[in-house]
Amino acid sequence: MGVSTPVIVPRGGAPVPPGPDQDLILGQVAREIEEKGFVLSNVDSLVNWARAGSLWPMTFGLACCALEMIHCACARYDLDRFGTVFRPSPRQSDVMIVAGTLTNKMAPALRKVYDQMAEPRWVISMGSCANGGGYYHYSYSVVRGCDRIVPVDIYVPGCPPTSEALLYGVLQLQKKIKRTGALYR
């Protein structure tokens, strides 16, 4: 078994391959430890990296889009490989995927479940019905977009959207989490 040399990535830059440039960076870190006794770093980026790699979505399947959401968790697309594990409880999850038609009677329940989720929390709106009412937009009993009830971070278009589209939405959410600069939203 071989031992691999770590690749250093300076903040905001490209990875530095093993060699003299990496030795310079390691030398600077070693000098800083000798002079000050500690190294200053950004904890936010580490925490956001960990959060992005371990999303726990709560399924809020309301209509036919929920089938595509379930399909995305099965063997072909396997969201588990991205650290995404579906949770049945809002207290255990940090992402809510709203999939399907949101009615006026269901809107208070959606808000209640959202409020039960711990901070920081994110919402993915999946499908035309969740995004803006979809086919039932002009019905008296349909909310014209779940963003009127909860703040939405990622919109996944389609009727119903494919599993690939939801997978792309999850990857976009991971990028968004890594970009944020605060520990709390």
From Swiss-Prot:
Query: What's its catalytic activity?
Result: a quinone + NADH + 5 H(+)(in) = a quinol + NAD(+) + 4 H(+)(out)
Localization recorded for this chain is: Cell inner membrane
Which InterPro entries does the protein's record reference? Answer: NADH_UbQ_OxRdtase-like_20kDa, NADH_UQ_OxRdtase_20Kd_su
Q: Where does [4Fe-4S] cluster bind?
A: C64, C65, C129, C159
The alphabetical list of record keywords is:
4Fe-4S, Cell inner membrane, Cell membrane, Iron, Iron-sulfur, Membrane, Metal-binding, NAD, Quinone, Translocase, Transport, Ubiquinone
Q: How does it sit in the membrane?
A: Peripheral membrane protein
Q: List the disulfide bonds.
A: none
- Broad class of the protein's primary localization: membrane
**NCBIfam families in alphabetical order:** nuoB_fam, PRK06411.1
By sequence similarity, the record places it as follows: Belongs to the complex I 20 kDa subunit family.
Q: How does it assemble?
A: NDH-1 is composed of 14 different subunits. Subunits NuoB, C, D, E, F, and G constitute the peripheral sector of the complex.
This protein's name: NADH-quinone oxidoreductase subunit B
Provenance organism: Rhodospirillum rubrum (strain ATCC 11170 / ATH 1.1.1 / DSM 467 / LMG 4362 / NCIMB 8255 / S1)
Task: Name the gene.
Answer: nuoB
